[in-house]
UniProtKB/Swiss-Prot annotation:
It is a multi-pass membrane protein. The gene is yidC. Interacts with the Sec translocase complex via SecD. Specifically interacts with transmembrane segments of nascent integral membrane proteins during membrane integration. The keyword Transport applies. GO terms for cellular component: plasma membrane. It comes from Histophilus somni (strain 129Pt) (Haemophilus somnus). This is Membrane protein insertase YidC.
């Protein structure tokens, strides 16, 4: 029992270390120096770049139109056709707030916009200025029962008609942004499509218990998914040539991503402007030649919304990896599927967490039973082991040999009680990242005072109950500890971890509390069986 408790203590500390280490790697980014923040409002329809062809920032402002379906409301600037605002209609800005969550925005405090255009020899989005599109109407809304809403923005120059067509579909956060180019000029033209996400340079935020990453990410033919933080952008510009792929900006629970034509050759890039305190991640395609009299359509998609794994996987390969479970993904993914399955049945995410706990504990029950049986046998051997310690004294080699001989004779595995604890470590870490990354748990209520399972318990009731359950579990297996210092550590361990869990998401604390209560029930059941065999009663003294 001593070794089991020690291992549990070390396991929890190890889990804490792994979580802290991952937080340091992904989130503890030095904050860049703020310079000329007042100039951020000048960006508006800006293309941020150091190259000579993609448009630079401009003071001019176009007309702003609104596009809306049943899940988001978008603001589009007719100067350049950039998406400069998005409101997610099914997500509250704050708990119990009636205001929708704002993802894309462009104001004096924060810039986060999705830009796209045409550069190159005959591009209309050069440094000299952006295309000033014309459109009839100001508000375009997908009607109930309508399968598709197309909103064309039109611009004409030198005999060429450029249509930037936005396509919205019901229930989808994927916005099609297509260029339809009709060349009525006497000569061929050449354009280079590009798209980028521009964001105010910020550091990742959150606490050690609930860290959040804000920064870039991309996918290429060589790399399924890789983060590229704002600090990385400031150190070196990204320059990757690939077929297919995508670029994205991530934040807690939400993501915006440009997905180019997956059959085209693209260059993924990043750019920073420290003067205006901005960073961009984007792509540009290979030049496209349009003969006179011909029409060419260039397809691209913009995802701007929550990290919904199933929907994102349908939009682009590996886009669902923006729900980042770290190294425990192979456990977290099936756990999340199980969690959503149970939630669909019980219609409560808190009950679903308890359901997942029941399944996990049921799977581990044979090992748990073996653990307590092994512990009971080990306690039976304590008098003989104590006798060996007194007999062999300082002769540790002889004592070890005799102990191994005794274990073999009694068919006892001294490490038999460790396996369930070791198996629970990666499960706990996987659940931590599942609860951290799942937007489905954002503002999801349980019962009573727990109105948001993704946030800490506001009254710390769950952590206190968890600490009490650990204390009860400890008292159910009383074993004297020889070392007084170790005895004190073990006595205070429930209190230590109660304090440790005070600021963890309520969903994670609920899992640990449910796990402890189920373990108490399992332990009582197992001990009853051991008493019938005469094992438990013989060692309780």
């Amino acid at each position: 029992m001593d070794s089991k408790r020690s291992l549990l203590f070390m396991a929890l500390l190890f889990i804490s270390f792994l979580i802290y280490q991952q937080w340091q790697v992904d989130y503890n980014t030095p904050k860049p120096e703020m310079t000329e923040q007042a100039q951020v409002s000048e960006v508006n329809s800006t293309a941020l770049t150091a190259t000579s062809d993609i448009a630079n920032d401009t003071q001019a402002k176009g007309r702003v139109i609104t596009l809306e379906n049943d899940v988001f409301r978008l603001k589009v600037n007719t100067l350049g056709g950039d998406v400069i605002g998005s409101e997610l209609l099914n997500y509250d800005a704050e708990l119990h707030s009636s205001a929708p969550f704002v993802l894309l925005q462009n104001n004096a405090d924060k810039v986060y916009i999705a830009q796209s255009g045409l550069v190159g020899k005959n591009g209309i989005d050069s440094r000299a200025g952006r295309a000033n599109y014309q459109v009839e109407g100001d508000v375009f809304k997908l009607a109930e029962g309508q399968q598709e809403l197309k909103v064309p923005l039109v611009f004409e120059k030198d005999g060429v008609i450029y249509r930037k067509v936005f396509v919205l579909k019901p229930g989808s956060y994927a916005l099609e942004v297509n260029f339809e180019i009709t060349n009525q000029s006497p000569k061929p033209i050449e354009v280079v499509p590009y798209a980028q996400l521009t964001h105010t340079l910020v550091e990742s935020s959150g606490s050690m218990a609930m860290p959040t990453y804000t920064g870039g990410a991309y996918s290429s033919s060589e790399t399924n998914y890789k983060k590229y933080s704002f600090e990385d952008m400031e150190k070196a510009d990204l320059d990757i040539h690939t077929k297919a792929g995508w670029v994205a900006l991530l934040q807690h629970y939400f993501v915006s991503a440009w997905i180019p034509n997956q059959d085209a050759n693209n260059t993924l890039y990043t750019l920073t402007n420290t003067k205006k305190h901005l960073g961009s991640i984007g792509y540009r395609s290979a030049p496209i030649v349009i003969e006179n009299g011909a029409t060419e359509t260039i397809h691209t998609q913009l995802w701007t919304g929550p990290k919904l794994q199933d929907q994102m996987a349908d939009v682009a390969n590996h886009l669902d990896l923006t729900v980042d479970y770290g190294w425990a993904w192979f456990i977290a993914k099936p756990l999340f599927k199980l969690l959503t399955l149970i939630q669909s049945l019980v219609q409560n995410w808190g009950l679903a967490i308890i359901g997942v706990t029941l399944v996990v504990k049921a799977i581990l029950y044979p090992l748990t039973k073996a653990q307590y049986t092994s512990m009971a046998k080990m306690r039976m051997l304590q008098p003989k082991l104590q006798e060996m310690r007194e007999r062999f004294g300082e002769d540790r080699q002889r004592m070890s040999q005799e102990m191994m001989k005794l274990y073999k004779e009694e068919k006892v595995n001294p490490l038999g009680g460790c396996l369930p604890i070791l198996l629970q470590m990666p499960i706990f870490i996987a659940l931590y990242w599942t609860f951290m990354e799942a937007v489905e748990l954002r503002h999801a209520p349980f019962f009573g005072w727990v109105q948001d399972l993704s946030a800490q318990d506001p009254y710390f009731i769950l952590p206190i109950l968890m600490g009490a359950s650990m204390f009860l579990l400890q008292k159910m297996s009383p074993t004297p500890v020889a070392d007084p210092m170790q005895q004190k550590v073990m006595t205070f361990m429930p209190l230590i971890f109660m304090v440790f869990f005070l600021f963890f998401p309520a969903g994670l604390v609920l899992y640990w509390l449910a796990s402890n209560l189920i373990t108490i029930a399992q332990q009582w059941l197992i001990y009853r069986g051991l008493e019938k065999k005469g094992l438990h009663t013989r060692v309780k003294k």
